[in-house]
Amino acid sequence: MNLNFMPLLHAYNHASIDFHFNSSARDFCVHEVPLYEFSNTGEHAVIQVRKSGLSTLEMLQIFSQILGVKIAELGYAGLKDKNALTTQFISLPKKYAPLLEKNTHNLQERNLKILSLNYHHNKIKLGHLKGNRFFMRFKKMTPLNAQKTKQVLEQIARFGMPNYFGSQRFGKFNDNHKEGLKILQNQTKFAHQKLNAFLISSYQSYLFNALLSKRLEISKIISAFSLKENLEFFKQNNLSVNSNALKALKNQAHPFKILEGDVMCHYPYGKFFDALELGKEGERFLNKEAAPTGLLDGKKALYAKNLSFEIEKEFQHNLLSSHAKTLGSRRFFWVFAENVTSQYMKEKAQFELGFYLPKGSYASALLKKIKHEKGEKYDKF
């Protein structure tokens, strides 16, 4: 497979929308929503921290330096953007809590502010969040483009959007996935095991994005072309589909088509199950009750069946499925933005947007859906 970045297909077919977005603390805000309520008792202090101009890892280093706590003792649910105003929850051993108030000024000098202090019985771990609330401000937005943007947002609110991994996964030079493959091939290795694991996960992410783009292409072809043309397309691609199955696929109201053998998952979380009754699953997908998932290949990955598997197998890799430390998983192909709000200020030519996404989903993916830039290969922030 070609490992160079290829343009990823967009979900919707509107023309490009021109505006300016600057990923900065003024124009981009991220607010973490915790997975559970904190009990206010326990051996771990839980602080809600607001930061700007710092990555999560840089923030942890500052806490370590100022409080004397080891970085390994700090818990966090996920990485937050550096070029944004973000809030997130951090856990640390209870004994360090008294030092927080004493060092308020030192922390504020480093662009960190403690918003709240609580306690809990366990350390926060990666993935311990429901999702994130986002705010974005677009500039140089004309009234016509504001109207187009609202129309796109209506589509996204109704149908959702592709759950592509964002550029954070692939690094400054968009080559993390290549390094991950080299690690699997024993061509390179780093001393830090977490770095090796992250780079391998970048390769998984690259394959997932490519698979999702392929599935979008197939969905668009099913919707746009006649039954006869579709039968010819599937035949040329060595995919076995009869005319009745294709009719059923064309009748699915959602733009992303559920295929026979897809691995579904209750949305926004729940158990995996196979798509057997496509009409029924299509309705559940449309109602945001369940969604199809894509492969993150690994030793214990759950694979699709039938037609879905025939497409998916092109994006599997035996080095992932045989790698002892890469267990594999599945990820929603599609996610639904919630609580979408927008406001256009004509006199300032500015458009403000707020929305919520579940954990693991990227605001940059929604930005791409709106801008719809031709030839776009990866996210701008």
Curated annotation (Swiss-Prot):
SUPFAM superfamilies: Pseudouridine synthase (SSF55120). The active site is at D81 (nucleophile). NCBIfam families: PRK00984.1-3, tRNA_TruD_broad. One of its GO terms (cellular component) is cytosol. It catalyses: uridine(13) in tRNA = pseudouridine(13) in tRNA. The lineage of its organism: Bacteria, Pseudomonadati, Campylobacterota, Epsilonproteobacteria, Campylobacterales. PROSITE patterns: TRUD (PS50984), UPF0024 (PS01268). Its EC number is 5.4.99.27. Keywords: Isomerase, tRNA processing. GO terms for molecular function: RNA binding; tRNA pseudouridine(13) synthase activity. Responsible for synthesis of pseudouridine from uracil-13 in transfer RNAs. The gene is truD. This is tRNA pseudouridine synthase D. GO terms for biological process: tRNA pseudouridine synthesis. Belongs to the pseudouridine synthase TruD family. Residues 160-335 form the TRUD domain. Gene3D superfamilies: TruD, catalytic domain.
